[in-house]
């Protein structure tokens, strides 16, 4: 027997019963970002490897260990995108979107990282990315956070996701803090785990993001970045917190919050849940004013966020009822009337275009069809058999309430269904 081919580890199939949750989520994303007049942009899933090395940082875990990189037939080093911001900036520069312009952009699509797969973490994963360009200051950051909260409310998730904030300050203040942190960690280097000792010499701020419980007491005593902020950075962060307070958006300041990408400055934020274990971050973002210039464009203030759709779907399944709704399941009694049943179902769709109607064309027994009708979650079963064809009637059975079934003429069926909704 020929061995079957399996999906690549960490790259899962999305099956039909899961799609309604994805569709609900994607539609909510599009609705919310459109309400703020952000415009969609699409760019390739494959970019030159140099793009990510320059933006994400060569000393980051993503570039060092997680990127899917290959050499094409022309000898060029290419990479499947591990995140969307770098590609969005590249597209903006290449197509002149940032030249003396303000841009509000969004995208939705797959990203790729070679991480250890577990619940909420996959090697192919989907993100909603939202990016703003040309606007400095805290107000646009507040708008991004307001947008996130509006999305959680649209999804019914606002009670299980909370906001954490921090500031990385300007590059000057962050460099001063970096030196103080390195000095502190070097004095306690023997207490660090192997991964943190490696990061100490490459990307020391990432040690603050360690999930190792044995390191938490040591990190709690580490210097705090907020103590190294210059006056400009302090005013920026204070204004953002004031705006969130005025809008009654609850948040906590997390001094150990850093982002895994080197290009962030000033504000960083994460939306976190306690319902997904270790993969509790469902959305993260911040400000990255130096990124456009880093990629060869004109100095342009920028901010944005990315939300992980797989993790949001996991949360959705816990709070939303089945989203795969069927209004009518058409039971066709006997192979002799399948064609008539199919044509009548199509006529129903013409006059009830908003209704979801499924016709059973299997030719199987009534018992089997009613089992499928009940399992489908449909509100009504509409029975069409030889007797109904002869008398120009249908039998309508309510599947969710214990009420007598009705025998209706085809003319009265439509008005009855509309009245029952």
Swiss-Prot record:
<dbReference type="InterPro" id="IPR006195">
    <property type="entry name" value="aa-tRNA-synth_II"/>
</dbReference>
<keyword id="KW-0030">Aminoacyl-tRNA synthetase</keyword>
<comment type="similarity">
    <text>Belongs to the class-II aminoacyl-tRNA synthetase family.</text>
</comment>
<dbReference type="GO" id="GO:0005737">
    <property type="term" value="C:cytoplasm"/>
</dbReference>
<dbReference type="InterPro" id="IPR004154">
    <property type="entry name" value="Anticodon-bd"/>
</dbReference>
<keyword id="KW-0547">Nucleotide-binding</keyword>
<dbReference type="GO" id="GO:0005524">
    <property type="term" value="F:ATP binding"/>
</dbReference>
<dbReference type="InterPro" id="IPR041715">
    <property type="entry name" value="HisRS-like_core"/>
</dbReference>
<dbReference type="GO" id="GO:0004821">
    <property type="term" value="F:histidine-tRNA ligase activity"/>
</dbReference>
<comment type="subunit">
    <text>Homodimer.</text>
</comment>
<dbReference type="InterPro" id="IPR033656">
    <property type="entry name" value="HisRS_anticodon"/>
</dbReference>
<keyword id="KW-0436">Ligase</keyword>
<keyword id="KW-0067">ATP-binding</keyword>
<protein>
    <recommendedName>
        <fullName>Histidine--tRNA ligase</fullName>
        <ecNumber>6.1.1.21</ecNumber>
    </recommendedName>
</protein>
<dbReference type="InterPro" id="IPR036621">
    <property type="entry name" value="Anticodon-bd_dom_sf"/>
</dbReference>
<dbReference type="InterPro" id="IPR004516">
    <property type="entry name" value="HisRS/HisZ"/>
</dbReference>
<dbReference type="InterPro" id="IPR015807">
    <property type="entry name" value="His-tRNA-ligase"/>
</dbReference>
<dbReference type="Pfam" id="PF13393">
    <property type="entry name" value="tRNA-synt_His"/>
</dbReference>
<dbReference type="InterPro" id="IPR045864">
    <property type="entry name" value="aa-tRNA-synth_II/BPL/LPL"/>
</dbReference>
<keyword id="KW-0648">Protein biosynthesis</keyword>
<dbReference type="GO" id="GO:0006427">
    <property type="term" value="P:histidyl-tRNA aminoacylation"/>
</dbReference>
<dbReference type="Pfam" id="PF03129">
    <property type="entry name" value="HGTP_anticodon"/>
</dbReference>
<keyword id="KW-0963">Cytoplasm</keyword>
């Amino acid at each position: 027997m020929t061995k079957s081919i399996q999906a690549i580890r960490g790259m899962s199939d999305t099956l039909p019963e899961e799609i309604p949750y994805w569709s609900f989520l994607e539609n909510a994303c599009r609705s919310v970002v459109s309400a703020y007049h952000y415009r969609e942009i699409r760019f390739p899933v494959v970019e030159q490897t140099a793009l990510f090395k320059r933006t994400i940082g060569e000393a980051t875990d993503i570039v060092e260990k997680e990127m899917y990189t290959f050499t094409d037939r022309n000898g060029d080093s290419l990479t499947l995108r591990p995140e969307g911001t770098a590609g969005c900036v590249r597209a903006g520069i290449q197509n002149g979107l940032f030249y003396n312009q303000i841009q509000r952009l969004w995208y939705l699509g797959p990203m790729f990282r070679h991480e250890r797969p577990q619940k909420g973490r996959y090697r192919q994963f989907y993100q909603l990315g939202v990016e703003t360009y040309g606007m400095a200051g805290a107000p646009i950051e507040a708008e991004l956070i307001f947008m996130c909260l509006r999305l959680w409310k649209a999804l019914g998730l606002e009670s299980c996701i909370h906001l954490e904030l921090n500031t990385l300050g300007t590059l000057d203040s962050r460099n001063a803090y970096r030196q103080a942190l390195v000095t502190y960690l070097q004095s306690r280097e023997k207490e660090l785990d192997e991964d943190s000792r490696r990061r100490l010499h490459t990307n020391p701020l990432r040690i603050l993001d360690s999930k190792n419980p044995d390191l938490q007491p040591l990190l709690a005593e580490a210097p705090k970045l907020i103590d190294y902020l210059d006056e400009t950075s302090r005013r920026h962060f204070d204004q953002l917190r004031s705006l969130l307070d005025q809008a009654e958006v609850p948040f906590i300041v997390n001094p150990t919050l850093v982002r895994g990408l080197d290009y962030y400055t000033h504000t960083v934020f994460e939306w976190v849940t306690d319902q997904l274990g270790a993969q509790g971050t469902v959305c993260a973002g911040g400000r990255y004013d130096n990124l456009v210039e880093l990629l060869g464009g004109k100095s342009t203030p920028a901010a944005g966020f990315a939300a992980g759709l797989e993790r949001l779907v996991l949360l959705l399944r816990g709070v939303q009822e089945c989203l795969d709704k069927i209004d009518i399941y058409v039971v066709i009694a006997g192979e002799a009337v399948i064609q008539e049943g199919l044509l009548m179902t199509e006529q129903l769709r013409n006059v009830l275009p908003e209704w979801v109607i499924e016709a059973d064309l299997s030719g199987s027994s009534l018992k089997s069809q009613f089992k499928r009708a009940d399992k489908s979650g449909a509100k009504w079963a509409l029975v069409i058999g030889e007797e109904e064809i002869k008398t120009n009637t249908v039998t309508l059975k309510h599947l969710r309430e214990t009420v007598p079934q009705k025998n209706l003429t085809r003319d009265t069926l439509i008005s009855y269904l509309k009245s029952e909704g």
